[in-house]
Amino acid sequence: MDLQREIDAAVERGGGVVRVATGEREVLPFVLKSNVTLELADGAVLLASTNIADYAAALGERCFVGAEGATNIAIVGRGVIDGRGAVFREIGGLKGESQPQALPVLMRFTRCRDLRLEDFTYRRGAAWGCHLKNCDGVAMRRVKCFNHVNNTNDGIDIESANVTIEDCDIDADDDAIAFKTESDKSFAVTNVTVRNCRLASCCNAVKFGTGSYADFRDVTIEDCSLVRAKGNHRFNWWKSIPGVTNRICGIAALALEVVDGGRMDGIVVRNIEMDGYQTPIFVRLARRRDPPAGAETYLRNVLIENFRGVADSRIASSITGVPGLRPRGITLRNVSLVVPGGGTEADAAAQVPEKERAYPESFMFDKMPLPAYGFYVRHADGVLFENVDVKTASPDARKPFVFDDVN
């Protein structure tokens, strides 16, 4: 099936619907264009080419499904987009590129407006599953993702504004949903809602960062389940993280990170059920990279409420800044957690390194459990805990809360 030819023909007619009937078809990478809807029938499967030479980076970056600068485009229906990404595992050094650069993203939408994604499944990408890059106006509903075959198998990467994601099931080896501000360091991720979704990851279920050069503003995550992934290709944390209690688990259920000079303001996370992560909550403001001269970087005005879950390691939740950079205005309300326990007197007395320029993860502090079993807070202002309860499944010598340089 020459899908690109059919899309181009629809454009010549002024737009319309391109229908893919039931059945499997190997398809070359293609580009959606303005006013075109791709409709995948129930039982239709688009199989991505497994020849890297077919991914000629027509849009500047390799992807199977692409669009750039398009308006009023959609992918709908109950069919499947299959990246067959496992065959790309060994690719590296292509024209001097590293593996993540060389591997094609399954779907990438760049600077598009009025994008609609509904009801289909995407799976087995070579790299990221769906990259929403500097778009304005995105609705994703009832979409399923299963991305567990390769490096950097994120579910959704959001660098866009005015986005609604609801009733979706995202299961990924890397982050399930990652908000980033790195492709265009002046583009703000703002006015985003993620609602009523199942999010599963072997890394972070919901992550802001790591790329954090610009603004994250007015983002709401609500009524979601952050749960254990159903697959695991890359990560065996039980081998490298002391005290991990399950062979398949993620790093953090919720990770809020500003480490590249960006800004975060007005984040709401509420009505969350969590299971299958080493650490429930990780908040980090640091200076992996310095902001431009004279620019301000901050992480402030975060509300986390009605958050319940069971953790899979002794690594506590944390809210940390570094000297000169302090998260502020962080409220946790109605939070109920069960953690494994097992912390020792040595854990309670441990000195936590600053790691100002380190890559941020909840285990970044030399993989130590941290001096608290509940929350460790350092270099922060205006942190409010209201009706927060942390129980241990076994005895623990640490305190539930430890505060260091906190106002």
Where in this protein do the model-derived segments appear?
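Extracellular/periplasmic carbohydrate-active domains that bind, remodel
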Residues: 1-407
